[in-house]
């Protein structure tokens, strides 16, 4: 999919654009947008609206052919709901409808002339990014492992945004950001959708190496012997049951000043989670290939910011392995020593994500980070608490952590990839007490998402930290089964804003 802009001025008008299709907006009160009015020279569009052929409700569409006085072959009327102001939800519904309509058109090029600056509290750049991300999402396919691939859908391959001449620079920047973000989302989806016999820890490491070569990043992959030398006993305890060798990936984009402290993203990379000796139920266990969603999302985020050449220092760290049962697997009741020196009683081997993350969170101290954000499909309890709409955001409660939380929440809202802040309090730490070690790896059934975050918090005392639990948002089940690409939009928006602030 190719995206570009068409600046409009006195000489180049909406009606004079020669293209396969032009999309314009109508509203619920049977009112035409400015672009629709410009195309309604002979009254055909207003007649369709008055006759009730299109309601104007957000997401409604009507395709017209051969509109008199219009150079475009087709005009796609798109409902935007209430006019003043247009809500984010209604605009998103409208562009999703446009994306669906474009996939079935007989045209290869189309122009979008929606009122990009009409969304409440949002600018044209936001509307362009929203449109591109929805269009790319609608066109995403994962069929690389099918012997007989479905033919690629016909339809629009090039989308042009009609913008005012004054908005040209802003529109170009918005397109570049959205395309890079969409490329990162697609990578995250592809990695998540691959089966665990393909997307192994070694595969993730090779993906990082390829990305480093393509975008001139720095990469290091540590193996088992190196992890043993670092005394990562907690991480390694999870790897004991699998024949797949563990990997510890460090990928660096040093786009900022040499003296600037980096933002570190830590992604949980369990490429298949059987639960280990604490074996999961068989139903839907295939979906545990998605337990590397954190790793996939931080790789996708790194791809996006590398493509943008973001002027910010960002380091991605991924501890990756399988969690499998075998004669050599870690057993419930085993006690392991983490890289930090703290000991952990493993009461449940299916609470393994925190065991790999805690050593990674200790490792990243060496970078003296400006902030650390770990991303993990960590707990089913987070799904119980928040469903599949919001990721769970956990931080400590002080000025620095409140500021980081607010940045992430704002990035989530701006990108449509929302999170909800959850508590971390000392009272929950009591649930992690062990009679035999410094802590247990589970805290009982109550508040499971919170106690998991509290466990991680014990390893983050030397820097500002946030934890994103994406167990409910990283993938979908059922007929629409597949990786969502979240939270790449949130993370890239956060990092772009950080880079702009650092200028």
Curated annotation (Swiss-Prot):
Cofactor(s) for this UniProt protein: Mn(2+)
Main subcellular location of this protein, as a coarse class: cytoplasm
Organism whose genome encodes this protein: Herminiimonas arsenicoxydans
Alphabetically ordered keywords of this record: Aminopeptidase, Cytoplasm, Hydrolase, Manganese, Metal-binding, Protease
PROSITE patterns in the record: CYTOSOL_AP
One GO process term, biological-process aspect: proteolysis
Binding site for Mn(2+) 2: 268, 273, 291, 352
Signal peptide range: none
Name the UniProt record assigns to this protein: Probable cytosol aminopeptidase
Localisation per UniProt entry: Cytoplasm
């Amino acid at each position: 999919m190719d995206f570009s802009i068409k600046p409009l001025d006195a000489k180049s008008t909406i009606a004079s654009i020669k293209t396969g299709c032009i999309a314009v907006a109508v509203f619920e009160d049977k009112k035409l947008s400015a672009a629709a009015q410009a195309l309604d020279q002979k009254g055909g569009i207003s007649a369709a609206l008055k006759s009730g052929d299109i309601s104007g409700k957000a997401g409604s569409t009507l395709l017209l052919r051969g509109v008199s006085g219009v150079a475009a072959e087709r005009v796609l009327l798109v409902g935007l709901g209430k006019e003043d102001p247009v809500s984010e939800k209604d605009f998103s519904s409208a562009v999703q409808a446009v994306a669906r309509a474009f996939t079935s058109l007989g045209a290869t090029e189309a122009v979008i002339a929606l009122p990009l600056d009409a969304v409440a509290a949002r600018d044209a750049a936001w509307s362009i990014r929203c449109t591109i991300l929805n269009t790319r999402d609608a066109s995403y396919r994962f069929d690389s492992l099918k012997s007989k691939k479905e033919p690629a859908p016909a339809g629009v391959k090039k989308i042009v945004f009609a913008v005012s001449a004054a908005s040209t620079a802003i529109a170009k920047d918005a397109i570049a950001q959205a395309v890079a973000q969409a490329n990162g989302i697609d990578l995250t989806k592809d990695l998540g959708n691959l089966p665990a016999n393909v997307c192994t820890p070694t595969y993730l490491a090779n993906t990082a190496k390829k990305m480093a070569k393509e975008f001139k990043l720095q990469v290091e992959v540590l193996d088992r012997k190196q992890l043993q030398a670092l005394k990562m006993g907690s991480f390694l305890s999870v790897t004991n049951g699998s024949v797949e060798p563990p990997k510890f990936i460090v990928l660096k984009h040093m786009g900022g000043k040499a003296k600037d402290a980096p933002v570190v993203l830590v992604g949980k990379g369990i490429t298949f989670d059987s639960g280990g000796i604490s074996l999961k139920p068989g139903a839907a266990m295939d979906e545990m290939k998605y337990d590397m969603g954190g790793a996939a999302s931080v790789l996708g985020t790194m791809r996006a910011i590398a493509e943008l050449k973001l002027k910010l220092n960002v380091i991605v760290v991924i501890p990756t392995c399988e969690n499998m049962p075998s004669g050599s697997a870690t057993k419930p009741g085993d006690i392991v020593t983490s890289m930090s020196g703290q000991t952990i009683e493993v009461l449940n081997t299916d609470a393994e994500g925190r065991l790999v993350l805690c050593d990674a969170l200790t490792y990243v101290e060496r970078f003296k980070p400006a902030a650390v954000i770990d991303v993990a499909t960590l707990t089913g309890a987070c799904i119980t608490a928040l469903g599949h709409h919001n990721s769970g955001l956990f931080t400590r409660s002080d000025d620095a952590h409140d500021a980081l939380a607010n940045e992430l929440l704002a990035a989530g809202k701006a990108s449509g990839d929302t999170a909800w802040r959850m508590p971390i309090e000392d009272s929950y730490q009591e649930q992690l007490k062990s009679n035999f070690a410094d802590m247990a790896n589970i805290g009982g059934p109550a508040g499971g998402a919170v106690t998991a975050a509290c466990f991680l918090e014990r390893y983050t005392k030397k820097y500002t930290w946030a934890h994103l639990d994406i167990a409910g948002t990283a993938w979908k089940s059922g007929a629409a089964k597949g990786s969502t690409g979240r939270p790449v939009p949130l993370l890239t928006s956060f990092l772009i804003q950080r880079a702009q602030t650092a200028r």
